[in-house]
Amino acid sequence: MMVFSSTFIFLILELVVLCEASVHTIQIKDKHFVDTVTGKPFFIKGVDYQPGGSSDVSEKQDPLSNPDACARDILLFQELGINTVRIYSINPDLNHDACMTMLAMAGIYLILDVNSPLQNQHLNRYEPWTTYNEVYLEHVFKVVEQFSHYNNTLGFFAGNEIVNDKRSAQYSPAYVKELIGTMKNYISAHSPRTIPVGYSAADDLNYRVSLSEYLECKDDDKPENSVDFYGVNSYQWCGQQTMQTSGYDTLVDAYRSYSKPVFFSEFGCNKVLPRQFQEIGYLFSEEMYSVFCGGLVYEFSQEDNNYGLVEYQEDDSVQLLADFEKLKSHYQNIEFPSMKTLKETVQMEETPSCAEDYENLKIESKIAKNLGSSLIKKGVKVEKGKYIDIHEDQLSTNVTILDKHGDRWNGPKKIEIRQSLTLADLEGEEQEDADEDKDDLKRKHRNSASISGPLLPLGLCLLFFTFSLFF
């Protein structure tokens, strides 16, 4: 009787494990990102990814709409050793389930910009009042609605370099801050969990710090307008430099008292080729990790601006460039600090109240009140993202991959499964649709998911072993 009882309990525990989600969500705790299950700090070690440039987004395609292209590139992401990609533009009217599932299985998270170059899908930095309307907000909300249902969506960027010169600094700041709050209100009303909203700043010392302080500050009337994280686009470390000659020491000091997570949303100067990426060793060292939460190298694919890690050839093959190998050698040797270490080194700060003015910025603006409130109340119509059952063949690529010398690359041609998706991952969205009253429960469930990929096969084996005791 005792054997039966213990075996029965074990069987129940295994079934519970199989029904819990495997893809851990990432949330913000103090000034860093944290894995909600393990409690370990999450440092961004990634690349910016927009094959063909932002102009390649259309009604028919975007970077996450082609599963074959995703399989080809995600296995190369794994070869680099990254854990995050940033994508600048997508079309929410396309299906992204296969590519997001592949990223999740590969253990890779997404930071997604909500704007696109298509009409009515971005802010006019010089005349934002002409574009900040309900048509634009509907596009933004559709992006948020769709991607908030993937556990590996790490965060959203409300804008990229919208403020980048004297003229835009006079007109755009207030609209960016308003957009951040409006997005957060929509997430609070409709998303299954809280997903942070940030901004990616231009590499311009005239505005970078003052804009960060303005977007950070808390207005008593609209506390939700405070940014959740801040991205810095920086290209000041070129070739062989030091913290002092590159100006990184000044950069770190500028954000030392910032109350939100800060990271490089773009980095990797290309004035010296091949790029050495020497700054990565410092970025994840004690000199910087108390202030910066990692970064994203610009960029994965070779475009006209010559920052690529790989180059797509006319015959559909892909060639790894010298920068790819350099970045790989640095990323694969990174060790993240522990939470204990961070607590000993990170200076915690309170979010400041808003000041009356900020250097080089004009923050007064007459933005229409309650714009988007009706959309927030009723929600937008878009296909909600969900993980799908991916066949093993879909994780492989038949594309010819060449090394930097033009010879056939002898690396893997298949995505390595690092997170096996469970029934909860694959069916969670259907359950949410069936019972909207369980939203609060779902939020708790997603934030308390506990099984990681390698444990799932073990759980299955133990489950079958348990059954064998009876038959």
UniProtKB/Swiss-Prot annotation:
Compartment annotation: Cell membrane
Record bears the keyword Disulfide bond: yes
Entry binding sites for (1,3-beta-D-glucosyl)n 2: 161, 203, 208
Family annotation (InterPro entries): Glucanosyltransferase (IPR004886), Glycoside_hydrolase_SF (IPR017853)
Coiled-coil segments on the chain, per record: none
GO cellular component, one term: plasma membrane
Membrane topology: Lipid-anchor; GPI-anchor
Domain of life according to the entry: Eukaryota
Lipidation sites (GPI-anchor amidated asparagine): 447
Keywords, ordered alphabetically: Cell membrane, Cell wall biogenesis/degradation, Disulfide bond, Glycoprotein, GPI-anchor, Lipoprotein, Membrane, Signal, Transferase
Signal sequence, renumbered to the chain: 1-21
Cysteines joined through disulfide linkages: 70-99, 217-354, 238-269
Chain residues that bind (1,3-beta-D-glucosyl)n 1: 88, 160, 298
Any one GO biological process: fungal-type cell wall (1->3)-beta-D-glucan biosynthetic process
Glycosylation sites: 151, 398
First-level EC class: transferase
Any one Gene Ontology molecular-function term assigned to this protein's record: 1,3-beta-glucanosyltransferase activity
Keyword Protease included in the entry's annotation: no
EC number from the UniProt entry: 2.4.1.-
Catalytic residues of the enzyme: 161, 266
Prodomain positions: 448-471
Task performed by this protein: Splits internally a 1,3-beta-glucan molecule and transfers the newly generated reducing end (the donor) to the non-reducing end of another 1,3-beta-glucan molecule (the acceptor) forming a 1,3-beta linkage, resulting in the elongation of 1,3-beta-glucan chains in the cell wall. Involved in spore wall assembly.
Similarity-based family: Belongs to the glycosyl hydrolase 72 family.
Official protein name in the record: 1,3-beta-glucanosyltransferase GAS4
